[in-house]
Structures are given as C-alpha cells and as structure tokens.
C-alpha cells in the first residue's frame, strides 16, 4: 500500500512502529531512510522525538554528563520526555537525532541511608564493569514503590560499526529491595546483534534470574552484589558462546546453505546439451516438449 493513500494518523502509527523496531545503534539511519519516503519534516520530527525517547529507554542509551556516564532507562524517566541523573543531580531532555542534551535543570535529592548505599553499590559495580567490559557503562538508581526502597543497577556495552555491517549490544538490569537481613535480586541479561552483510540476520538472547543475598552491612552487600552479577554474567556469556557455536556449525549451515546431494549416478551431458539447444533454439513442434524436458532436468 502506498503511503500517500494513508491518513495522517495511519502514517503516524506506521512511522512510529517502524522507528521503535530499529535495532540498537541504527535509529538515526532508520529515521533518515523514512524521511526520504515520507517527505513531511514536521511529522517526522514529532514521531522521531517520541520514538527516540522510547528507543533510549529500551536500549539504555549512554550519555556523559560532567565526565560521568549516564544510562537512560524507564527507571529514571520524569515525564515530558525528561530524564533524571542521580550522580549529577540534573534533569534534562535528550535529542537522540541530534545527540544533544536540552533544557537541563538542577534537582535536589534526599540524602539518607538508601542514597549512601546506592553510592557504595555504584562504586563496586563500576570496578566490575571496568574489569570486564571494553567500553562498558553502569548506573545505579533508586526508586520508592509503596514506601519500599529499591535499587536498580543497569549495565550497558555496545559496538556499533555500520562500516563492517554489524551492530551489537549487551545490557543487564538488576533490582533488589533494601532490606535489613535478606534481599532478593531480580535480574535480566539481554544481548542483541544485527548482521547485514550478504544476509540480514538478527540475534536476540535474554535470561531472567532470581537470587538471594544476605545483608550484613552496606559494604558487604555492595561487594556481594557485584560478585553475584559477575558470576551470573560469566555463566550467561559462556552459554551464549556455546549456543552460537552450535548454531553456526549445525542450524545455520543447514538453513542458509544446502549441501550438494551425492547422487552417484552418471550424467548424460550429451542429452542435456541437446535438450538445452531445443529450449534455447526451439523449432516448430518442439517448444512444449523442450519445456517439459528442462523442468524434469532441473527437478
């Protein structure tokens, strides 16, 4: 269906749906391609802002504020397309298309035991990320739900290389409640890769986890949490590598490339050549016969 026959609302839905499906690192490319098709700058700008805000939350887009990394997620959304950073105590809007911070405002935070624990966990997690990720980023947020305090830790690393025709993202999220003796950690690890040289191949792998941690003091909890994340992510990485190796050796080879059959029969090349001559240079009365012979030969 041509886009010209769609109403404005239908166009908005189509544009939004296509933009939110853009793989990590390819949002701007998808937006530019759609601009060539839509040719409506005002419509594309509005949809790009909305979809870009969702894209940032979905893939934990990293920023740098005052030299400190900030990960955007739905946990630090304030509304009206604004995000909040606990480290810098700033709220802002982020334009993904222009890669710019806008409308920056300062905010105060309540300094209590949970805030101190957040900073301690952040230090322990940053040490782990620096040791295990080439260009990793992490952030620890706090949230209050029904008078209960939670800490949310996010980790992100990516490699976007459109020149080599592939993009990859690793992210994980860990949530636990601030309890005095025992707390349950809920985590999710997510990996996505997109290869688009010769073939268009998308790979998504994720795993949900639940573990318990004893709480003695804040320093012990922070170190135990960092060790838990390291242990679970190492296991996940080893399992993913094993599965991808098996996939490349067996499934992909069978799906994307079919081996030539071994027939162990003699081929009558002379007959094939004569049949091809009939097809390529048909004479009166031989056209129908030649088509059937060629079809049988191909099958």
From Swiss-Prot:
<keyword id="KW-0009">Actin-binding</keyword>
<keyword id="KW-0597">Phosphoprotein</keyword>
<comment type="subunit">
    <text>Component of the F-actin capping complex, composed of a heterodimer of an alpha and a beta subunit. Component of the WASH complex, composed of F-actin-capping protein subunit alpha (CAPZA1, CAPZA2 or CAPZA3), F-actin-capping protein subunit beta (CAPZB), WASHC1, WASHC2, WASHC3, WASHC4 and WASHC5.</text>
</comment>
<dbReference type="Pfam" id="PF01267">
    <property type="entry name" value="F-actin_cap_A"/>
</dbReference>
<dbReference type="InterPro" id="IPR017865">
    <property type="entry name" value="F-actin_cap_asu_CS"/>
</dbReference>
<dbReference type="GO" id="GO:0008290">
    <property type="term" value="C:F-actin capping protein complex"/>
</dbReference>
<comment type="function">
    <text>F-actin-capping proteins bind in a Ca(2+)-independent manner to the fast growing ends of actin filaments (barbed end) thereby blocking the exchange of subunits at these ends. Unlike other capping proteins (such as gelsolin and severin), these proteins do not sever actin filaments. May play a role in the morphogenesis of spermatid.</text>
</comment>
<dbReference type="InterPro" id="IPR042276">
    <property type="entry name" value="CapZ_alpha/beta_2"/>
</dbReference>
<feature type="modified residue" description="Phosphoserine">
    <location>
        <position position="2"/>
    </location>
</feature>
<dbReference type="GO" id="GO:0007028">
    <property type="term" value="P:cytoplasm organization"/>
</dbReference>
<dbReference type="InterPro" id="IPR042489">
    <property type="entry name" value="CapZ_alpha_1"/>
</dbReference>
<dbReference type="GO" id="GO:0016020">
    <property type="term" value="C:membrane"/>
</dbReference>
<keyword id="KW-0117">Actin capping</keyword>
<dbReference type="GO" id="GO:0051016">
    <property type="term" value="P:barbed-end actin filament capping"/>
</dbReference>
<keyword id="KW-0206">Cytoskeleton</keyword>
<feature type="modified residue" description="Phosphoserine">
    <location>
        <position position="290"/>
    </location>
</feature>
<keyword id="KW-0963">Cytoplasm</keyword>
<dbReference type="GO" id="GO:0007286">
    <property type="term" value="P:spermatid development"/>
</dbReference>
<dbReference type="InterPro" id="IPR037282">
    <property type="entry name" value="CapZ_alpha/beta"/>
</dbReference>
<dbReference type="InterPro" id="IPR002189">
    <property type="entry name" value="CapZ_alpha"/>
</dbReference>
<dbReference type="GO" id="GO:0003779">
    <property type="term" value="F:actin binding"/>
</dbReference>
<dbReference type="GO" id="GO:0061827">
    <property type="term" value="C:sperm head"/>
</dbReference>
<dbReference type="GO" id="GO:0007015">
    <property type="term" value="P:actin filament organization"/>
</dbReference>
<protein>
    <recommendedName>
        <fullName>F-actin-capping protein subunit alpha-3</fullName>
    </recommendedName>
</protein>
<dbReference type="GO" id="GO:0030863">
    <property type="term" value="C:cortical cytoskeleton"/>
</dbReference>
<comment type="similarity">
    <text>Belongs to the F-actin-capping protein alpha subunit family.</text>
</comment>
């Amino acid at each position: 269906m041509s886009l010209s026959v769609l109403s404005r609302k239908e166009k908005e839905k189509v544009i939004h749906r296509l933009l939110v499906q853009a793989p990590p690192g390819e949002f701007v490319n998808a937006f530019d391609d759609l601009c060539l098709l839509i040719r409506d700058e005002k419509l594309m700008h509005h949809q790009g802002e909305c979809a870009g805000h969702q894209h940032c939350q979905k893939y934990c887009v990293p920023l740098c504020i005052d030299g400190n990394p900030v990960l955007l997620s739905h946990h630090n959304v304030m509304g009206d397309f604004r995000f909040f950073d606990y480290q810098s105590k700033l709220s802002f809007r982020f334009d993904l298309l222009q890669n710019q911070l806008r409308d920056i405002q300062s905010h105060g935070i309540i300094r209590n035991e949970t805030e101190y624990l957040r900073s301690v966990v952040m230090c322990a997690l940053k040490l782990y990320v620096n040791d295990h990720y080439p260009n990793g980023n992490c952030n620890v947020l706090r949230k209050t739900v029904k008078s209960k305090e939670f800490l949310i830790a996010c980790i992100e690393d990516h490699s976007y290389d459109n020149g080599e025709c592939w993009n990859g993202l690793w992210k994980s999220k860990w949530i636990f409640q601030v309890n005095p003796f025992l707390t349950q950690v809920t985590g999710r690890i997510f990996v996505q890769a997109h290869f688009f040289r010769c073939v268009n191949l998308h790979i998504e792998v994720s795993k949900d986890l639940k573990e318990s941690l004893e709480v003695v003091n804040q320093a012990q909890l922070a170190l135990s949490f960092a060790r838990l994340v390291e242990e679970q992510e190492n296991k996940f990485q080893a399992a993913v590598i094993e599965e991808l190796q098996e996939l490349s050796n067996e499934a992909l080879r069978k799906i994307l490339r079919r081996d030539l059959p071994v027939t162990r029969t003699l081929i009558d090349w002379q007959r094939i050549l004569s049949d091809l001559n009939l097809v390529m240079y048909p004479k009166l009365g031989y056209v129908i016969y030649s088509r059937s012979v060629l079809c049988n030969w191909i099958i």
